[in-house]
């Protein structure tokens, strides 16, 4: 039985203009529906493949601020989200999340600033700007992870060392075991290694489920580690 908060998304491409860049994204062509059957779902693919665009659309359609934060964050420093949010319908389950957060690396500074502005005596600021970038990014993620929550993360590994990624991995896994749901865009072979997750690959003109070992993130990392000198010789020799 699927007990996820977001059980899937249905696309209505008739609501998108024919000249929209969205219709030029190869992975989107022909896609009508995507199911979320696991507590943790990953989107992987090359830059520009549409994975962050879809995650953002899911977030906005579900009521989150396009730049990130909880549903209570209402601000806009640069309105750039796509119209895809108006062309999707989210299939929601019988459960309702008790907490939620949309975390994206590219607008982290703005969200951290707003967190300080929204702070009061009952909800003191975590002072993210007083920490290093990596420490503050991990702290923000940790402070907003709760059981039975819904979390949309866009490249959470961007500011994190490999060791910190392992810390985040453990917390995501633990939280998912307590009823939370995660949809995560990532290039990290570390995060992708979380057990019992679905991985959607955005490649070859489609969106499809794939195994961990079949992801480019894993294959390129493995190839580099196992054949570092040979690869460097090929890449760096004129």
What spans do the regions from the language model cover?
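N-terminal pre-Walker A segment at the start of P-loop NTPase domains
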Residues: 1-32, 37
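ABC ATPase nucleotide-binding domain signature region
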Residues: 40-42, 53-117
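The conserved Walker
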Residues: 46-47
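Conserved glycine(s) of the Walker
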Residues: 50
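GG-anchored amphipathic helix commonly corresponding to the ABC/SMC/Rad50 NBD signature/C-loop
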Residues: 131-155, 163-175
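Conserved D-loop beta-strand region of ABC ATPase nucleotide-binding domains
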Residues: 154, 184-185
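C-terminal lobe/lid and adjacent interdomain/linker elements of RecA-like ASCE P-loop ATPase modules
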Residues: 163-181, 188-238
């Amino acid at each position: 039985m699927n007990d996820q908060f977001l059980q899937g998304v249905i696309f209505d491409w008739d609501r998108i203009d024919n000249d929209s860049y969205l219709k030029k994204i190869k992975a989107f062509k022909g896609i009508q529906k995507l199911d979320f059957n696991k507590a943790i779902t990953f989107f992987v693919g090359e830059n520009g493949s549409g994975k962050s665009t879809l995650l953002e659309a899911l977030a906005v359609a579900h009521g989150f601020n396009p730049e990130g934060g909880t549903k209570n964050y209402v601000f806009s420093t640069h309105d750039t989200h796509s119209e895809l949010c108006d062309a999707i319908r989210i299939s929601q389950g019988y459960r309702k999340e008790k907490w939620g957060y949309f975390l994206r690396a590219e607008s982290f500074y703005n969200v951290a600033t707003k967190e300080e502005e929204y702070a009061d005596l009952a909800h003191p600021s975590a002072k993210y700007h007083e920490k290093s970038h990596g420490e503050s990014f991990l702290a923000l993620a940790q402070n907003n992870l709760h059981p039975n929550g819904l979390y949309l993360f866009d490249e959470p590994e961007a500011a994190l060392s490999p060791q910190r990624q392992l810390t985040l991995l453990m917390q995501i896994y633990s939280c998912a075991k307590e009823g939370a749901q995660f949809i995560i865009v990532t290039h990290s072979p570390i995060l992708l290694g979380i057990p019992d997750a679905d991985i959607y690959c955005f490649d070859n003109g489609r969106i499809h489920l794939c195994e961990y070992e079949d992801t480019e993130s894993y294959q390129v990392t493995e190839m580099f580690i196992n054949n570092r000198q040979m690869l460097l010789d090929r890449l760096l020799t004129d």
